[in-house]
Structures are given as C-alpha cells and as structure tokens.
C-alpha cells in the first residue's frame, strides 16, 4: 500500500507497504490480500505457494478508489523453471531462469483479480529479438508437487508489456502461462489443473 509500512501487521488499519512483506505471509484458507488502488509496486513481484479450500478460497485483489494496483516487475521476481526431462526436440529449452510478476506455485482455490501487471524487458537494454533474453511472464502458474490443483480464478487483470524471449516457446513466456513440471516424487503424483477461469 502507498500508505503502508512493512513494520505493520498487515491488517486493514495497519497495511503493509511492499510485496516483499506479502510474500513472507503464511496465508491460510479464507485469507485476503488487498492492494491499495493507486499503488505502484516498482521492481516488485508477488510469488505465492498457498492453498485455500473450496469453502474458504484465498483472495488477492484491490481496495480503495482510483487506478488498479500496478505490479511493475521489470525483470525481477526470478525463479528457476525445470520440466525435469528434455522435451520433444533437443533444441527446445526445458530449463532456465524466468521472471514472473505473479507466480502461483502449486496454488489452488485462489482468486487473483483487479490488478495491473507488467514485466518490461527494456530496463536491461535487451532488444526485442535478443537470443538470450530473459523469459518473462505476467502471471505464471506451476503445478509440480501437489497433484491435481483446483479452481484458480484470474479476473479483470490488465496485463501488458510482458517482454520475454520470443524464441523459448516452451518456457514460461507471455501474459499468462500455466505449466505442469515433473514432480519430485513422480511415481506418487498425477499432475493436473482442474479448473482455470
């Protein structure tokens, strides 16, 4: 929140300031994270590994008046993507670093709405078609170690200027990109995302 402080407890009357503080929260079923409208989270990102329930989903949204809260990541929020196996052709990149403004890692029963998201590439002077340009996403969804994931709702998001690598079509690149990765205990997991809206 533009009126927050990371020393606060994150309640309505004592909001946090940065997404770094939000990323440290241990969100539980039924919890809400509301970002103040008019806030700009420059060079920040929202990376979550949370699970709500059907009865008590977790909600990420906005409050107040004015423009949608803007998460302007600019190539930050870097994580390592690894499918776990080579893909159908040896030239296809199957692992590497990705910058994601919003990362939903093994999340379920979660709603994210009413946000503006960008992840520009020009910050580091990368040209549009640079062959080793950073892979970027606005929203990345990953299913890996929790089996079937249920009900991820993305609504009223304005995602723009996500400038990733135009060649790595199998990596998380684009406005919204969901991927199933090889789980750590592959023999015990069946990966599926049952419902995305």
Regions found by a protein language model. Give the residues of each.
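Right-handed parallel beta-helix/beta-solenoid
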Residues: 1-20, 37-39, 67
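Short, T/G/N/S-enriched strand-turn elements that build extracellular solenoid repeat scaffolds
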Residues: 20-26, 41-52, 70-74
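Structured segments of extracytoplasmic/periplasmic soluble domains
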Residues: 25-28, 36, 118, 160
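Surface-exposed loop/turn positions
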Residues: 30-31, 39
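Right-handed parallel beta-helix/beta-spiral solenoid domain characteristic of secreted/periplasmic
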Residues: 34, 49-128, 163, 167
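Extracytoplasmic/periplasmic beta-strand context in beta-sandwich domains
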Residues: 44, 58, 100, 137, ...
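Right-handed parallel beta-helix
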Residues: 57, 61-66, 108-119, 147-163, ...
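Asp-box/WD-like beta-propeller blade repeats and closely related beta-sheet repeat scaffolds
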Residues: 125-144, 161-186
């Amino acid at each position: 929140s533009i009126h927050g402080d990371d020393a606060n407890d994150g309640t309505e009357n004592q909001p946090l300031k940065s997404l770094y503080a939000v990323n440290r929260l241990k969100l539980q079923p039924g919890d809400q994270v509301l970002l103040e409208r008019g806030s700009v989270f420059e060079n920040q990102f929202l990376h979550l590994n949370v699970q709500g329930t059907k009865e008590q989903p977790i909600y990420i949204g906005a409050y107040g008046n004015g423009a949608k809260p803007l998460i302007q990541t600019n190539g930050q929020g870097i994580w390592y993507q690894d499918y776990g196996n080579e893909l159908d052709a040896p030239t296809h990149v199957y692992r590497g670093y990705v910058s994601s403004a919003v990362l939903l890692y093994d999340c379920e029963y979660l709603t994210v709405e009413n946000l503006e998201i960008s992840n520009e590439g020009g910050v580091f002077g990368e040209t549009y078609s640079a062959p080793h340009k950073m892979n970027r996403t606005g929203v990345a969804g990953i299913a890996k170690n929790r089996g079937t994931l249920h009900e991820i709702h993305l609504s009223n998001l304005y995602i723009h200027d996500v400038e990733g690598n135009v060649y790595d079509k199998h990596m998380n690149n684009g406005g919204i990109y969901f991927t199933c990765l090889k789980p750590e205990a592959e023999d015990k997991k069946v990966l599926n995302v049952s419902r995305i809206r």
